[in-house]
Each structure stands twice: as structure tokens, then as C-alpha cells.
């Protein structure tokens, strides 16, 4: 929520006033992070030069030749500063978040704790594999939809200012006139991490989910069934489509502070599992 609500140049409202997110508070030197991920599953590794030597925690396959690096200058989200402004136009309000795209990845520090069950019909047809991942580490990366500059946001690494397009044009002109001066502005992506219990669902061909729309429909139905069976609010459970668009998988995780424990029950308690499947 913080990544999108308090994203670069975003407009927020408080006590009837309009505020623009203008700066990120820096506590030290800005340090970039390297992320490698498996596009088939969404499993991610941070700051590991030899990520290709790892195996995927879902498929067990080697990441050699499979993993991809997330391009750009990735920095961790810190506290933001917003300035009140009365000159924000309706067009600016509508445009600000349209340029955001939030991507979700995951990993686990204890793969031995991952357990699996199978989603089956009453007659035993195998529909999907479900893995329960306790203390799953979720990584959210905020990018710009603008394909230029590695989908990053213009950021002054010395002051923490988010640089508007107008200021960037002036800055580039000055850089051309004085190339000897150091350039503190970089195009960055923001990330944040959290830990939550999660389940990872791999649909099989027998489910006949032929496109991403069908996958999202299945994801919504399964998530809604969990909410209904365990009587929890929709905001307490998050869900994302993960991995390859041709063979997408599903990640469902607990959003509430502290563990709800419902996803663990789903995998470990047959009665809870059957109730959710029947409801879905």
C-alpha cells in the first residue's frame, strides 16, 4: 500500500488539502540492490551474484540460464515527504498513478518448512498442486510504465527529491553545458519487503485454464472461498497471478498483521481444505 499511495509524485489528500509526494527521507548513502528472479514462478533472490547456482523453491529446477535480473537501480522505500499544493490539476491527479506498475515476487528462507497438498475433484482428478509457505518473504517492486530509463523514476540521490519531467529537462540541459559536474540524479525503482504466510497454487492442464482471464477468475473464486469459510475480511488476504503468462500460477497470502493461521489450516486440515474446495 505504501509503495502506491506514497509513490513518486503521487497526490494524496489529508484534512481537505492536496499534497504531492516530493521527497524521500534519506538516512544515509543510497545503496542499489540487485534482484534475480525466475520468470516461470516469480521466485526472487536479492543481492546474490551467483543466483544461477540456486534451485527454484517451487519447481526444484536449476536457475542456471533461467533466472533474469530486474533491470535498473532498485532502492528500498523509506519515509516520504509530501508538500501541500493547490496547483494540482485534475489531469495531473488522473495521470500520477497511471504510470505506476507494482510487481510481486516471493521467496523463502526455510524451504524445509514448505509443505504440499493436491487439489482434487471428488472422483480423484488431480487439478492443482498447493504449497504452503510459512513466513514467505514477499517483495514488492514499484516501476514506472514508461519504458524509457529502465522503467525508473527520476530521483536525486543526494537530496532525496523526486524530479519532475520539467526539472529533468532543465537538469539535462545543465549537464550538457557542464559535463564535468557530478550527476546525482538516477532513474530508480522502489521496493519493500514483508513476511507473511502464503500458499502457492500450480494449476494443472486438467483445470483447463486456457488464458490469464480464466486464471484470474479461478484465483478470485478460491480467495473468496477462503474468506467465506474462515470468515475473514477480503483485505486480510492478498492474491496475485505469478510467473509465466502462458502457464500462470497463483500466490495467496495473509495481509493482516500477525499470522491469521488460515492458510496453514487449509493445507494441514482436511476438513478445512474440503470446505474451501467445495465453496470455490
Language-model segments: which ranges?
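Residues immediately within or flanking Cys/His clusters that coordinate Zn2+
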Residues: 3-6, 32-35, 42, 50-53
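Long, charged amphipathic helices and adjacent flexible linkers at domain junctions
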Residues: 24-30, 35-37
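Short solvent-exposed strand/turn elements
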Residues: 39-42, 80
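Extended, highly charged accessory segments
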Residues: 1-16, 22-25, 52-280
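Zinc-coordinating Cys/His ligand positions in small cysteine/histidine-rich zinc-finger domains
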Residues: 46
Amino acid at each position: 500500500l505504501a509503495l502506491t499511495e506514497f509513490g513518486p509524485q503521487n497526490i494524496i489528500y489529508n484534512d481537505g488539502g492536496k499534497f504531492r509526494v516530493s521527497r524521500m527521507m534519506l538516512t544515509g548513502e543510497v545503496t542499489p540492490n540487485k534482484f534475480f528472479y525466475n520468470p516461470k514462478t516469480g521466485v526472487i533472490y536479492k543481492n546474490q551474484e551467483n543466483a544461477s547456482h540456486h534451485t527454484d523453491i517451487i519447481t526444484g529446477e536449476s536457475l542456471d540460464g533461467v533466472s533474469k535480473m530486474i533491470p535498473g537501480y532498485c532502492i528500498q522505500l523509506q519515509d516520504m515527504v509530501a508538500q501541500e499544493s493547490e496547483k494540482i490539476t485534475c489531469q495531473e491527479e488522473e495521470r500520477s498513478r497511471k504510470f505506476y506498475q507494482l510487481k510481486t515476487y516471493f521467496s523463502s528462507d526455510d524451504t524445509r518448512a514448505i509443505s504440499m497438498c493436491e487439489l482434487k475433484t471428488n472422483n480423484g482428478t488431480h487439478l492443482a498442486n498447493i504449497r504452503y509457505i510459512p513466513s514467505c518473504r514477499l517483495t514488492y517492486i514499484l516501476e514506472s510504465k514508461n519504458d524509457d530509463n529502465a522503467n525508473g523514476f527520476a530521483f536525486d540521490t543526494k537530496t532525496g527529491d523526486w524530479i519532475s519531467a520539467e526539472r529533468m529537462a532543465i537538469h539535462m540541459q545543465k549537464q550538457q553545458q557542464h559535463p564535468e559536474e557530478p550527476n546525482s540524479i538516477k532513474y530508480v525503482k522502489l521496493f519493500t519487503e514483508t513476511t507473511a504466510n502464503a500458499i502457492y497454487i500450480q494449476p494443472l492442464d486438467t483445470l483447463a485454464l486456457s488464458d490469464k482471464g480464466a486464471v484470474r477468475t479461478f484465483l478470485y473464486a478460491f480467495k473468496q472461498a477462503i474468506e467465506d469459510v474462515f470468515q475473514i475480511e477480503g483485505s486480510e488476504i492478498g492474491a496475485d497471478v505469478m510467473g509465466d503468462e502462458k502457464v500462470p500460477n497463483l500466490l495467496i497470502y495473509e495481509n493482516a498483521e500477525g499470522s491469521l493461521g488460515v492458510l496453514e489450516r487449509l493445507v494441514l486440515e482436511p476438513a478445512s481444505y474440503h470446505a474451501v474446495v467445495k465453496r470455490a
